[in-house]
């Protein structure tokens, strides 16, 4: 009995050590150490206490670094306090490996980004809230046009050298544009030929390779192709993904590579492809360059969307056993969804009106004139038609029911949506794009009054009245309606019962 007790005790110690180890500790034990480790949600080494990411606030341009708590989970409360009463962007995602492979705002390349001088957008600091073992943290919500990069990375694989990588992603946030990637890319932000990349791709693009079903799929961006297997076409063994939290893994070595994936909240990894390199010129041997990208393609293609929580790149080709242990660690982190809304509650099915709080305009309400969404002066004595135009039925968010959509009271089936960053009233065509354009998340009013209403699909952007017309605006940016002056007031609205 004593012998059995000692065996059980030893097993508990071993299990405790495994729980304490981070993904990069596990990779190191497997002989394939992390050369880049990025996460805004948690430490990826058990002993890491440095910064996870940096945020910059809109009010004064100040920055602060967000570090892990003793649990290893990011100190989201520190971010919330720093960003109170303003907006914040994620400016740096720090590399935890010690190699300095930090990710910053991606520069222009083969494609230019939407920001000044062709840079990509930075992500909102609040677009992707989650909990890890019940503790709040924030992921990186990548809207089209958003991207991060390091073109001078240290220790990453070059040429045909072996490497592995994984990422934890939101399996419900994707599109078919190029290319939501994380991994190894060109160092000049341009397409330099077949085989010059090796990165995780997630989405439902059908331009190059595909898997089974309609997608989304985990594939590899190897440059000039998204590959689901050895063929440039279809691999029926690469399944469509439906998990809310997804673990995606890619690894490659001379004439051998693999795609693996699974549910990041439970269970184990499956192998979707393992075999020879694509039998197309340029992929055997590979010509990897060693830059690191997030949310974009190697040439800065920036039309894709997705959400990133954590990921690493390794030196050497990890064994399946090592990756399986990393997956167990991810599952033990207990990723779960967190509320996307705050502030005054809205009731689905209710009729509401939305009054401006800017000093100029406190008698003006969000209304519509045909398809144009604007502000108009409305009161209880206004004509019935105007009162109907200034009233909105709250619906569960068409793209995400944790947020809301706003249906016109006088034009049934038509909703407020954004189009080219303007707000318009359009009939619901049932498309995925419409649903995303018409989904908005409320939060306590940034100026301290009422509510601010941010776009679910572009969480840096909020309902804003500007010259009496409604836009989704960011707190500073390239558009005239992104002006910082009066931003906090212009994006805060008092919600009350609808006029009709």
From Swiss-Prot:
Q: Which Cys pairs does UniProt list as disulfide-bonded?
A: none
According to the record, glycans are attached at 467
Q: Which reaction does it catalyse?
A: Hydrolysis of terminal non-reducing alpha-L-arabinofuranoside residues in alpha-L-arabinosides
Known pathway: Glycan metabolism; L-arabinan degradation
Pfam families from the entry? AbfB (PF05270), ArabFuran-catal (PF09206)
Query: Could you say which enzyme class this protein belongs to?
Result: hydrolase
Keywords, comma-separated and alphabetical: Glycoprotein, Glycosidase, Hydrolase, Signal
What's its EC?
3.2.1.55
On whether Hydrolase is a keyword of this UniProt record, the answer is yes
Record InterPro entries: A-L-arabinofuranosidase_B_cat (IPR015289), ABFB (IPR038964), AbfB_ABD (IPR007934), AbfB_ABD_sf (IPR036195), ConA-like_dom_sf (IPR013320)
Q: Please provide, alphabetically and separated by semicolons, the GO molecular function terms listed in this UniProt record.
A: alpha-L-arabinofuranosidase activity
Signal sequence bounds: 1-21
Cite a single GO BP annotation. arabinan catabolic process
Report the family membership. Belongs to the glycosyl hydrolase 54 family.
State the name under which the record lists this protein.
Alpha-L-arabinofuranosidase
| Organism ancestry | Eukaryota, Fungi, Dikarya, Ascomycota, Pezizomycotina
């Amino acid at each position: 009995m004593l012998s059995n007790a000692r065996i059980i005790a030893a097993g508990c110690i071993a299990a405790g050590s495994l729980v304490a180890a981070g993904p990069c500790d596990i990779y190191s034990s497997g002989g394939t150490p992390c050369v880049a480790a990025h996460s805004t949600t948690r430490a990826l080494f058990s002993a890491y206490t440095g910064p996870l990411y940096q945020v910059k606030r809109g009010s004064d341009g100040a920055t602060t670094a967000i570090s892990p708590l003793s649990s290893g989970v990011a100190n989201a409360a520190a971010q919330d306090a720093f960003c109170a009463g303003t907006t914040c962007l994620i400016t740096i995602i720090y590399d935890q490996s010690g190699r300095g492979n930090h990710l910053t705002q991606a520069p222009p390349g083969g494609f230019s980004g939407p920001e000044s001088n062709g840079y990509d957008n930075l992500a909102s600091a609040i677009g992707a809230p989650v909990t890890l073992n019940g503790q709040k943290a924030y992921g990186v919500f990548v809207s089209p046009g958003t991207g991060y990069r390091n073109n001078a990375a240290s220790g990453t694989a070059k040429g045909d050298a072996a490497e592995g990588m994984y990422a934890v992603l939101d399996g419900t946030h994707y599109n078919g544009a190029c290319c939501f990637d994380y991994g190894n890319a060109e160092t000049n932000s341009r397409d330099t030929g077949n085989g010059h990349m090796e990165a995780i791709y997630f989405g439902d693009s059908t331009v190059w390779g595909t898997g089974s079903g309609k997608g989304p799929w985990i594939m590899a961006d190897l440059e000039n192709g998204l590959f689901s297997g050895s063929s440039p076409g279809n691999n029926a063994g690469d399944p469509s993904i439906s998990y809310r939290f997804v673990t995606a893994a890619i690894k490659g070595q001379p004439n051998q590579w693999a795609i693996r994936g699974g549910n990041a909240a439970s269970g184990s990894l499956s192998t979707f492809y393992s075999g020879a390199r694509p039998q197309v010129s340029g992929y055997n041997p590979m010509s990897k360059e060693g830059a690191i990208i997030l949310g974009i393609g190697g040439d800065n293609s920036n039309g894709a969307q997705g959400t990133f929580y954590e990921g690493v790149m390794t030196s050497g080709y990890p064994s399946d056993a090592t990756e399986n242990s990393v997956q167990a660690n991810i599952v033990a982190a207990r990723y779960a969804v967190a509320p996307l809304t705050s502030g005054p509650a809205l009731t689905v099915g209710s009729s509401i009106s939305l009054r401006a709080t800017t000093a100029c305009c406190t008698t003006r309400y969000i209304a519509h004139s045909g398809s144009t969404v604007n502000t108009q002066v409305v009161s209880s004595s206004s004509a019935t038609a105007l009162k109907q135009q200034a009233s909105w039925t709250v619906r569960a968010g068409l793209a995400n029911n944790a947020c809301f959509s706003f249906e016109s009271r006088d034009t049934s089936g038509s909703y407020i949506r954004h189009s080219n960053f303007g707000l318009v009233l359009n009939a619901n065509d049932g498309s995925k794009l419409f649903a995303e354009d018409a989904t908005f998340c409320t939060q306590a009013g940034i100026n301290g009054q009422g509510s601010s209403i941010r776009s679910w699909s572009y969480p840096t952007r909020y309902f804003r009245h500007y010259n009496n017309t409604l836009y989704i605006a960011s707190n500073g940016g390239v558009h005239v309606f992104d002006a910082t002056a009066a931003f906090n007031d212009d994006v805060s609205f008092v919600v009350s019962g609808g006029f009709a």
